[in-house]
């Protein structure tokens, strides 16, 4: 009945407007019905559970059903590229050569030797390398002292650097579970129980924690902009969050108990002691947060530009702003901490974040660039029931991604005139009124984010999406699916450290296995990841637009 409906075919303007309103009302009814049906089924399942029964089972039907709605925008964003398979054996290092002889009895009398035909075969050895160290021992009667030779670097305890390296790489790099790591080691002939495997993965990792700190500091210094995202991580059954900070040269992980603005600042400052300042910038943030005018005037009398620690700041609030509510106190502390972060001269300060529009990411940096892919997902979530509205949505989504493609082209060749044109086209595109109410409301919300979505026009080196951080979050999700979550804060720190080193090594083209083995064996022949980040940063110049501004 509604398949052939086209509002443009209705000549009477009032009738056309009335039909449009009725269609939007029908969409609202359909959306409410879907939500009510889902809630009813959830309540039925809960009632059955309370009765000791089971909820409605999920049984796949015999007849094919339409696939669930895909919220990904890969198809719209991607342009097909030609692909050809290259030879891999030409670049392989040869570990050994083996001459395969021909049985002379199989050759005719006139056969003449013509050299060799080379065939490269890849293989790997997985076997034990148990070493009996016979340490020389001397005794000095005059000194009453016994002198014993030390073990080579990397050998400490029952297990050598090979086992330690393999366990760490399998658990953190290959995302294997702890029991499976132990099972694989035992299948290779290693006599090891579950407890020592856990200790190898978590205990005595101070050197790697130090390397992670260096990686993060180098990463923050490598560009004035950073990606940021978060995902959940339970520690010993308690809710927590993992923050992912990255750019093209590194990825760093931080597990915390909260994800508010103060916690995000803790992450960006690498958990150093919090600092606060009462200045004009902080007052502006407090006013924007919604603090009452009376409280704002009280704060204005405290402006002194002096950096304070948390104890001093809390004492100041208790003395001059007594009775401040918990939410108001959080607003004030966050504003003062952000102002102190911007005034910091002792470490790298992130000037722009590429992220989604979560409220805890706002105010922290001078500029904010929103993810276009995340914004596009909002349109994919619209589920119009009326074919006419479906057509309107499809047509606008095509225009949305066509504009996105123009922004991608601008990144490659940024021209001031093109930036002006793209700004005008953005304003035209997101001033569209389709008549489909849900779509028009979403378009208006996108238009309100213009400055953050068009940040690429001022800084062409930043990506248009937050995929690098989201990919980092997916790695934590996979780790969480396999291992559920760390049981201790020491374990959570080990997760953060080794996932940081594994992801960063991959971005820098460094073998994570060889890197871990190099450090555990004590050879330290490979350069540090932090040094590599610094070298690559000079080559890439990830802050070019800031250097010229």
Predicted segment positions?
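Mobile genetic element proteins and their domesticated derivatives, centered on retroelements
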Residues: 22, 43, 50, 107, ...
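Short active-site loop/helix that positions an aromatic residue
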Residues: 109, 361-366, 379-380
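Short, amphipathic alpha-helical "recognition" segments used to contact nucleic acids or chromatin
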Residues: 163-174
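Short, charged amphipathic recognition helices of the HTH superfamily
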Residues: 173-184
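Inter-helix linker motif
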Residues: 368-382
């Amino acid at each position: 009945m509604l398949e052939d409906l086209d509002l443009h075919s209705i000549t009477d303007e009032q009738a056309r407007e009335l039909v449009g309103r009725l269609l939007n009302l029908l969409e609202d009814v359909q959306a409410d019905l879907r939500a009510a049906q889902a809630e009813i089924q959830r309540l039925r399942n809960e009632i059955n559970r309370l009765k000791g029964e089971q909820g409605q089972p999920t049984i796949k039907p015999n007849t094919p059903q339409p696939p669930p709605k895909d919220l990904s925008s890969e198809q719209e964003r991607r342009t097909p590229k030609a692909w050809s398979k290259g030879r891999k054996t030409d670049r392989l290092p040869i570990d050994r050569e083996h001459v395969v002889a021909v049985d002379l009895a199989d050759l005719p009398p006139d056969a003449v030797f013509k050299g060799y035909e080379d065939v490269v075969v890849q293989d790997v050895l997985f076997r034990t390398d148990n070493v009996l160290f016979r340490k020389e021992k001397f005794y000095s009667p005059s000194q009453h002292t016994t002198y014993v030779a030390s073990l080579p670097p990397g050998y400490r305890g029952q297990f050598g650097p090979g086992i330690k390296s393999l366990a760490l790489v399998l658990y953190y790099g290959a995302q294997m579970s702890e029991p499976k790591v132990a099972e694989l080691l035992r299948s290779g002939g290693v006599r090891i129980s579950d407890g020592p495997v856990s200790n190898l993965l978590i205990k005595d990792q101070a050197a790697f924690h130090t390397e992670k700190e260096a990686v993060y500091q180098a990463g923050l210094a490598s560009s004035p902009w950073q990606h940021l995202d978060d995902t959940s991580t339970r520690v010993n059954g308690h809710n927590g969050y993992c923050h992912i900070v990255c750019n093209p040269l590194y990825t760093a992980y931080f597990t915390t108990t909260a994800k508010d603005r103060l916690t995000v600042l803790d992450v960006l400052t690498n958990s150093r002691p919090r600092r606060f300042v009462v200045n004009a910038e902080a007052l502006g943030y407090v006013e924007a947060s919604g603090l009452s005018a009376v409280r704002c005037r009280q704060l204005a009398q405290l402006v002194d530009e002096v950096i304070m620690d948390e104890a001093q700041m809390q004492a100041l609030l208790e003395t001059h702003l007594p009775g401040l509510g918990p939410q108001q106190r959080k607003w004030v502390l966050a504003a003062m901490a952000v102002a102190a972060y911007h005034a910091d001269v002792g470490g790298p300060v992130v000037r722009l974040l590429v992220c989604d529009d979560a409220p805890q990411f706002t105010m922290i940096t001078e500029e904010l660039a929103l993810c276009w892919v995340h914004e596009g997902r909002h349109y994919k979530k619209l589920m119009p029931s009326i074919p006419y509205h479906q057509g309107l949505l499809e047509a606008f989504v095509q225009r949305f991604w066509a504009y996105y493609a123009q922004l991608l082209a601008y990144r490659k060749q940024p021209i001031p005139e093109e930036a002006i044109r793209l700004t005008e086209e953005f304003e035209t595109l997101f001033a569209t009124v389709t008549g489909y109410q849900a779509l028009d409301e979403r378009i208006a919300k996108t238009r309100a984010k213009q400055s953050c979505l068009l940040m690429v026009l001022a800084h062409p080196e930043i990506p248009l999406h937050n995929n690098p951080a989201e990919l980092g979050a997916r790695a934590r999700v996979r780790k969480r699916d396999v291992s559920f979550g760390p049981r201790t804060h020491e374990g959570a720190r080990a997760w953060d450290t080794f996932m940081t080193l594994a992801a960063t090594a991959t971005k820098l083209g460094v073998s994570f296995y060889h890197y871990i083995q190099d450090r555990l064996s004590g050879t330290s022949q490979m350069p540090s990841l932090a040094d590599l980040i610094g070298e690559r940063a000079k080559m890439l110049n990830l802050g070019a637009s800031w250097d010229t501004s």
